[in-house]
Structure formats: structure tokens, C-alpha cells
């Protein structure tokens, strides 16, 4: 099984004291079965760039550049034409039901749907509404 890690999973693992349930779950997964979307990397970059504390921003930038990107080398899901076509269908499904999706989450959902992956996230609601397999390691 392939797992697509949401931004909040990587952020949680960066914390000085990550949630033990999340650590336990991630430790059960083979690294080669874990993937990230390029949208996740963009969300991380955005979060880093808005930090006003320069030393903290530099530390997080080093984490992204020297740890996360190399760790997921060859396992970053790009945004392709097929993923964008799936994204557009999901946008339309949401419109018909009166739901507006978070765009980074919807791109991640479209990526998971296209590649047959399960999303690992704390915020399942967007992914449930997009009808993609999702697991929240914070839940029992």
C-alpha cells in the first residue's frame, strides 16, 4: 500500500515532542511506501517563509532542504495533467454539494485518487468529502 503524507504529518514529526500515536503509525510504514505531493512541499515552503523569526525560519528551511526533500527523493508526486483533470472533477463534485474545498488539500486528494494512495492526515474532512481513502493516526 502507498501512503500520501499530508503537510500536518510532516509538521507533527518536526515537533520536539510529536504525538506518540503518529510516531508509532509512521514507524510501521516502510519508507519506500511513503510519498508526499509537490503541493505539500509548497505548503511547507509557504509556512516557512511567513515565519518572522529569522533563526527559526532558517532552521526550518534547512529541515525542508536537507532532510525532507532528500528523504522523499523520487517519491514526490508531481502535479500532472491527469491529476489536474481529477482535481477539476472534484471541484465540480464539491460545487454540486455546496462544498468549497481547500485547494492544497484537493490537489493532494486528486493525487491520492489518481495513484490509488491513502492519505495520512489529521484533517480528514476534506479527504472524506473527496472520497479518497484516508487515515488519521491521531485517532484510535
Predicted regions and their residues:
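A generic structural signal for short hydrophobic patches within well-formed alpha-helices
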Residues: 10, 41-44, 127
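Short, well-structured N-terminal submotif of metal-dependent ribonuclease cores
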Residues: 1-39, 49-66, 140
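Acidic, PIN/NYN-like endoribonuclease modules and their adjacent C-terminal/linker elements
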Residues: 1-2, 109-140
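Active-site neighborhoods of divalent-metal-dependent phosphate/nucleic-acid chemistry enzymes
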Residues: 46-52, 70-118, 122
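Active-site phosphate/pyrophosphate-handling residues
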Residues: 8, 45, 106-107, 133
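Histidine- and aromatic-rich ligand-binding microenvironments
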Residues: 5-6, 37, 100-102, 123
Amino acid at each position: 500500500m502507498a501512503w500520501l503524507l499530508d503537510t500536518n504529518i510532516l509538521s507533527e514529526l518536526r515537533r520536539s515532542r510529536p504525538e506518540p500515536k503518529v510516531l508509532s503509525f509512521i514507524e510501521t510504514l516502510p519508507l519506500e511506501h511513503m510519498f508526499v505531493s509537490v503541493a505539500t512541499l509548497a505548503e511547507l515552503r509557504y509556512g516557512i517563509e511567513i515565519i518572522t523569526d529569522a533563526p527559526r525560519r532558517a532552521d526550518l528551511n534547512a529541515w525542508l532542504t536537507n532532510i525532507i526533500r532528500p528523504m522523499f527523493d523520487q517519491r514526490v508526486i508531481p502535479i500532472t495533467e491527469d491529476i489536474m483533470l481529477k482535481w477539476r472533477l472534484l471541484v465540480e463534485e464539491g460545487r454540486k454539494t455546496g462544498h468549497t474545498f481547500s485547494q492544497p488539500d484537493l490537489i493532494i486528494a486528486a493525487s491520492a485518487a489518481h495513484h490509488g494512495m491513502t492519505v495520512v492526515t489529521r484533517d480528514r474532512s476534506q479527504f472524506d468529502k473527496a472520497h479518497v481513502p484516508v487515515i488519521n493516526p491521531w485517532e484510535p
